[in-house]
Amino acid sequence: MGCPSKGATGGGIVTTRVRLLVGTTKGLFSFESDAQRRDWTTSGPHLGGWEVYSALGDGHQGDRILTGTSHMAFGPSVRVSENGGGNWSQIPEGPSYSAESGFTLNRVWQIVPGHPSEPDTLFAGVEEAGLFVSRDRGATWAELDALTKHPTRAGWFPGAGGMCLHTILIHPDNPQRMWVGISAVGVFRTDDGGETWRTCNEGLARVPVGTPHPEVGYCVHKMVLNPDDPNTLYMQYHQGVFQSNDGAESWFPIENGLPGDRISAELGAPFGFPIAVSRSGDLFLFPLESSEQRTMRDGRLIVYGMRRGSDRWEPVGDVVPDEPRHVSVLRDALTIDSLEPYGVYFGTTSGEVFYSVDGGVAWDRMPGQFGRILCVKTWIQEDQDAA
């Protein structure tokens, strides 16, 4: 399956494959299409019975997929397939805290590639919150323990989903600068590759977690980087939606047009979990009913977007206008591919996967219904054949 086009070099034919990796509470599912993204094939469940909180299609090594998995009986692990999901094995030396640390590794929430200048590097964010690095494409892992040794560590407390490091962002021009998001602790930034870390939560309202450290106690749900300006970040927070224009030194609300926004003075700040940004700078998220209910407002599965250059959110798609959907979309279950026009994809807590290839105006549903969807990741593969 593929959409052929002339290659830029050698006169070959480049075939684009679009894969969607969907992690659920009962395994991983894979969807595949061509660049048109109209017809999809499905495979799975892979890793049946395992929770899959994170998934990464490793473009540096063929059909390699890495997953962060957990099981109520067997615990957490990183599992890898070298053939696109056909066979799986556990990485023996996966992320693991030392006995002396006093921490317990419960889940692997995030696996991301390192900076493009470091093709063998991977990072993993885990619960209890910590950051691990692999310099050999995932074969072995080491903790970047300056983060867990931060002076505020005694004041870290979990959110409702656990004390998880769920977001890892790398500056595109400077591999030494990274940001991480921890629930319900806050944002940290390093400017020296993880040797030291500083809190970056100015402008956010603390949540009542009882910590004596004023620098932490901030429940960041998800963050993304502006594709054109890496000093600009966007955040879905427990108590609103925020932007930073100074590398996370400070944050300010961007809620105009959202239900519950401060400008319209409706009760409560906009609550939600995921936020995603396209390569063109369009933003997408899902406002939920409230922190208490955590389901779609009035049972309507509506996607909100802020187009590049705008300062206002708009409802860009009523996904299932004729049916109620009292569901949620979790923090890592919304993603956007890198094609043009871009595709937007998300999965719900009731196990449905929806997608749009026109900027969120029209939506289709993938065939099938699955377990509670934990993560949705795109993987673009380009195969070049000889002319």
Q: What do these predicted ranges mean?
A:
Residues 1-387:
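Extracellular glycan-interacting surfaces
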